[in-house]
Amino acid sequence: MPGASDPVSPDPTRKDRDGSPSPGLREPDTGLRIDVFSLFPRLVDDFCSESLLGKARGQGLLDLRCHDIREQTTDVHRTVDDAPFGGGAGMVMRAQPIFEAVEVADPPRPLLLLGPGGRRFDQALAAELAAGDGFSLLCGRYEGVDHRVRQHLVDGEVSVGDVVLSGGEVAACLVIEAVTRLREGAMGNAASTVTESFGESGLLEEPQYTRPAEFRGWEVPDV
């Protein structure tokens, strides 16, 4: 498995399998395929059904497939976690349902685990992923995933910052939006991705104003 600092490069030779889009969305022709594996797939699917991402899905530019890891459990209680060997606080996500969820979906690679120890997600990595045909995200929960998932299943780990979240779903939404808006046709104005913060210059965007020219005594500077 690549280390946390290794480049994350989508496989351009990977061929997608047929899948079912979310209700109300047409089947994309050449859209960017992103598969998300989560215990709460609706969190991601609902967020990505609104605004720019919802439009991209409707236009066939984004083929988002959210998979419920719990569907691959084998017991009546649909157990996805267990106590860690050696003791300690919290629970660990079991390897079996994660492996089987991925194997059933046959998702595009790389498959990236969202976690605090991975490569820092930034605009450069977003552009790298946007240049490929697709990738997949694994959302952890609780105290994380069984380490064998890191060793034998995922291709790398990505971190959205030095913060603690309850799960990877919010981070997944961040990654999906940052990548999708870099795809051709996703933005209403193609120049937006060039002139905005972290665009071609790599710098922050200049201050922006709109009407009225004077508000509560504060005036827009001369252009």
Locate predicted features:
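Long, charged alpha-helical interface segments
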Residues: G199-V223
